[in-house]
A protein has these predicted regions:
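RNase III-family endoribonuclease catalytic core
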Residues: 1-104
Length: 104
């Protein structure tokens, strides 16, 4: 998702796309947590928006930039579809793992 050899203009564009993508991911994760948990859960929010979590898919900035680009090209619905395809399966897997640990 990210090339380490880029010029300054490309790097700035990537950062701007990632900044928007980060906000969209935050909204998606908050809505998902409320639907799954029925309550605010800041610990889960941090878990699913952290760079460590995003690195399971690729470079964290690159993942957020891809979400931002998808939003710019197709709106919120397209960005959510990207998240559901690329991140939601990992979110659900991790959520179930955390729930099992909590029940022990």
């Amino acid at each position: 998702f990210m090339n380490h050899h880029m010029d300054k203009a490309t790097e700035e564009r990537l950062r701007a796309e990632a900044w928007v993508g980060d906000a969209i991911l935050a909204l998606y994760v908050r809505e998902w947590i409320l639907a799954e948990e029925g309550a605010i859960n800041g610990k889960l929010f941090v878990e699913f928006t952290s760079n460590d979590f995003l690195r399971r898919t690729g470079n964290a900035t690159g993942v957020e930039a891809e979400i931002g680009r998808t939003f710019k090209a197709g709106g919120l619905e397209a960005a959510y579809a990207w998240i559901e395809h690329h991140l939601k399966p990992r979110m659900e897997e991790r959520w179930h793992t955390l729930r099992r640990k909590a029940l022990r």
